[in-house]
C-alpha cells in the first residue's frame, strides 16, 4: 500500500501543468526569472527585501538553473522579534547573504525529482548542497515534501514547482538557517 500511495503522489507531482500556480495572489510566468516573478508575490515581500539588501538580485536573475526554497512572509514573522530588522542592516549583509543562499541549490529540481531521489536513497533523504556551502536534506512524509536545514529544522513545501526561466521555486513555510 505504501508503494502505491508513493507512486500516486509521484504521479501527481509529475503531472504536467498547463500553467504555473499563482503565488501570493500573482501569476508566475515561466518566461520570467526568479526575481521578476518573486517581486509580484504578496507573500514574499520580506524575502524580496532581504534579497535586495543582500545584493543577490543580479545573481538570482542570472542563467542558473537554481532551485529556490522561498519562505513566505509568515515564516520570517515567526523568527524572534527584531531578527529581520537586524538582518536587513548593512553591517549584517554577510549573515543575511549566508541565510538567503542557504535556500538556493544549483540545478533545477522539481518536487517529483526531490521525492524520487529521497525515496531512492538508503536513508530516505535527498541531500543537497546550497550556494552558501551548507547542507539541506529533503524527505517525503505523509505525502508532503519536507526540507531540513543542518540543525534539523523542517520546512514544508506548500507550493511546489513554480517554474522560472532560470530554475524553479518551491514555496516553504519556514526560514531555514545555516549553522
Residue positions per predicted region:
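Gram-negative bacterial Sec-dependent N-terminal signal peptides
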Residues: 1-19
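Mature, structured domains of secreted/extracytosolic soluble proteins
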Residues: 6, 18-179
Amino acid at each position: 500500500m505504501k508503494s502505491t500511495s508513493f507512486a500516486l503522489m509521484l504521479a501527481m507531482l509529475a503531472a504536467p501543468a498547463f500553467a504555473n500556480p499563482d503565488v501570493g495572489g500573482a501569476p508566475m510566468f515561466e518566461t520570467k526569472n526568479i526575481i521578476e516573478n518573486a517581486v509580484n508575490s504578496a507573500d514574499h515581500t520580506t524575502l524580496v527585501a532581504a534579497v535586495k539588501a543582500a545584493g543577490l538580485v543580479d545573481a538570482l536573475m542570472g542563467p542558473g538553473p537554481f532551485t529556490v526554497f522561498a519562505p513566505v512572509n509568515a515564516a520570517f514573522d515567526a523568527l524572534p522579534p527584531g531578527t529581520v530588522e537586524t538582518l536587513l542592516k548593512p553591517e549584517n549583509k554577510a549573515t543575511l547573504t549566508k541565510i538567503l543562499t542557504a535556500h538556493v541549490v544549483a540545478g533545477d529540481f522539481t518536487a517529483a525529482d526531490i521525492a524520487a531521489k529521497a525515496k531512492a536513497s538508503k536513508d530516505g533523504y535527498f541531500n543537497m548542497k546550497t550556494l552558501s556551502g551548507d547542507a539541506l536534506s529533503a524527505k517525503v512524509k505523509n505525502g508532503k515534501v519536507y526540507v531540513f536545514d543542518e540543525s534539523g529544522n523542517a520546512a514544508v513545501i506548500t507550493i511546489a514547482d513554480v517554474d522560472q526561466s532560470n530554475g524553479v521555486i518551491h514555496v516553504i513555510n519556514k526560514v531555514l538557517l545555516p549553522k
